[in-house]
Design a protein with these regions (language model features):
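Extracellular/periplasmic envelope-modification machinery, especially enzymes
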Residues: 1-241
Length: 241
């Protein structure tokens, strides 16, 4: 999957697809680096729902491209525009991004405006809510413990706090403004009673403080399907009725 992230390519479905290959695509996954690490999670759900999804992601391009406070584009706009126009060909659009990092008013405004436009033309939007961040030092200690390196660690619980996200967290804003969107919250698997695990099946799922590793994303997808109905099956059902 070396052609799927930061290559600014669109439509290279043979190189970059998720789920079950079929004659026609069921949708497109777009976003920034969070979309890249969510792909393996989505692959588990897509295979279970028998969906065929293409993905195209690049850093700094959550839905469109990040913008400065004066409204100017932080990165070249062509990829964002071309990717969005391509996405409009499909009924289902999957979006994963660093939503916690989206605090600038101009970024938020552009994202919500674009989402509204997609919903108005009949697109089904599926948003992925990212895991709570851990700290680099916590992750480092967990890896030391996992490697059985003989170091003294005063704390062996490497779970992270399920800190409260602000009321204006953009995923909450999306759901308030556009109730029809589906939000798949990865925290539902990892967090309980105010604590969030960083491991599944004795495997650390984080690559760094806020990104999943591939094996962790796959485990997360499998764990999600054990405790939740697969929301993507509803998409497949609607497309065939």
């Amino acid at each position: 999957r070396k052609q799927c992230f930061d290559k600014f390519k669109i439509g290279n479905c043979k190189d970059c697809f998720i789920g079950i290959r079929k004659d026609t695509l069921d949708g497109l996954l777009i976003g920034d680096s969070f979309a890249n690490h969510t792909a393996a999670f989505l692959d588990v759900l897509a295979k279970d729902a028998r969906l065929y999804i293409h993905d195209s992601a690049a850093g700094g391009y959550p839905l469109m491209n990040n913008v400065n406070e004066d409204g100017s584009a932080r990165y070249p706009e062509k990829y964002a525009i071309d990717r969005l126009n391509y996405a409009k060909k499909f009924k289902n659009i999957f979006i994963a991004a660093n939503w916690e990092g989206m605090t600038e008013n101009k970024d938020r405004t552009l994202t919500l405006k674009t989402l509204g436009e997609l919903i108005r033309i009949g697109k089904k939007i599926i948003i992925f809510g990212a895991l709570r961040s851990t700290s680099d030092i916590n992750l480092h200690r967990a890896k030391l413990a996992k490697a059985k390196i003989p170091v003294y660690l005063s704390e062996r619980d490497f779970s992270t706090t399920e800190y409260k996200r602000p009321n204006n967290y953009i995923v909450y804003e999306m759901k308030r403004k556009f109730p029809s969107i589906i939000v798949i919250n990865l925290n539902d698997v990892m967090c309980k009673n105010g604590k969030c695990k960083i491991e599944l099946n004795n495997t650390i799922v984080y690559r760094n403080s806020n990104h999943l590793n591939t094996s962790g994303a796959i485990l997360l997808g499998k764990a999600y399907l054990i405790t939740h109905n697969n929301p993507l099956k509803e998409l497949n059902f609607k497309q065939h009725n």
